[in-house]
From Swiss-Prot:
Cytoplasmic side: 1-3
All ranges on the Extracellular side of the membrane: 25-226
Highest taxon, organism lineage: Eukaryota
GO cellular component: endoplasmic reticulum; endoplasmic reticulum membrane; extracellular region; plasma membrane
Topology in the lipid bilayer: Single-pass type II membrane protein
Subcellular location: Endoplasmic reticulum membrane; Cell membrane; Secreted; Secreted, Extracellular exosome
InterPro entries reported in the protein's UniProt record: TMEM98
Protein's name in the database: Transmembrane protein 98
Entry's family note: Belongs to the TMEM98 family.
PANTHER family: TRANSMEMBRANE PROTEIN 98 (PTHR32510:SF3)
Membrane-spanning ranges: 4-24
């Protein structure tokens, strides 16, 4: 049964990699003056990214290495902090959140592989698979929201949904694999993502129209001035 969850989380990691690649292709074409880092990459449409996850719902005996597709350019992309010209400065925070979620996913795969014999029950494995399948559409939603024109409210809502889904995956994986000690790095990663999310939320709030002052507000303001 542990093979099922390894395959499921492995496919999730594939979705992250493919989504990053799709995002870079679009943004390079629209913004960047430098040559495309993904010249040799076979770009899949977003619909295919979601569909690929759905086709993996049945158990399989494939090994993790047979599922995870590694793009030779992805590491260079993730390390490049200036690969996109973004006047708002919000896209870099979205990418940082995607990076954190991608790293968490890879490490969850490793933990699952090392904890196969400690799985509680088939229902625990089923929980992990269900939660993992919910994350891939969230990733695609974030990528879509990063296309211009940028909407800070949409960025905030979709990155929040993604982070909540990843946090849920962390919880069910910890529970299913009996993971307790030495998990500080997970909390630190989620905290770092929350910091980036706070910037997006602040930008979203800044776009809110100012609320007209009511009579009660005027009264309180006058009282405070006395």
């Amino acid at each position: 049964m542990e093979t099922v969850v390894i395959v499921a989380i492995g496919v999730l990691a594939t979705i992250f990699l493919a989504s990053f690649a799709a995002l870079v292709v679009v943004c390079r074409q629209r913004y960047c003056r430098t040559k495309n880092l993904l010249t040799n990459y076979n770009n899949k449409p977003t619909v295919d990214l979601i569909g690929a996850m759905e086709t993996q719902s049945e158990p399989s005996d494939l090994e993790l290495d047979d599922v995870v597709i590694t793009n030779p350019h992805i590491e260079a992309i993730l390390e490049d902090e200036d690969w996109i010209e973004d006047a708002s400065g919000l896209v870099s925070h979205c990418i940082a959140i995607l990076k954190i979620c991608h790293t968490l996913t890879e490490k969850l795969v490793a933990m699952t592989m090392g904890s196969g014999a400690k799985m509680k029950s088939p229902s625990s494995l089923s929980d992990i698979i269900i939660v993992a399948k919910r994350i891939s559409p969230r990733v695609d939603d974030v990528v879509r929201s990063m296309y211009p024109p940028l909407d800070p409210k949409l960025l905030d809502a979709r990155t929040t949904a993604l982070l909540l889904s990843v946090s849920h995956l962390v919880l069910v994986t910890k529970n299913a694999c009996h993971l307790t000690g030495g998990m500080d790095w997970i909390d630190q990663s989620l905290s770092a993502a929350e910091d980036h999310l706070a910037v997006l939320r602040e930008a979203a709030l800044a776009t809110e129209p100012e609320r007209p002052m009511t009579g009660a507000d005027n009264f309180l303001q006058e009282q405070s001035a006395i």
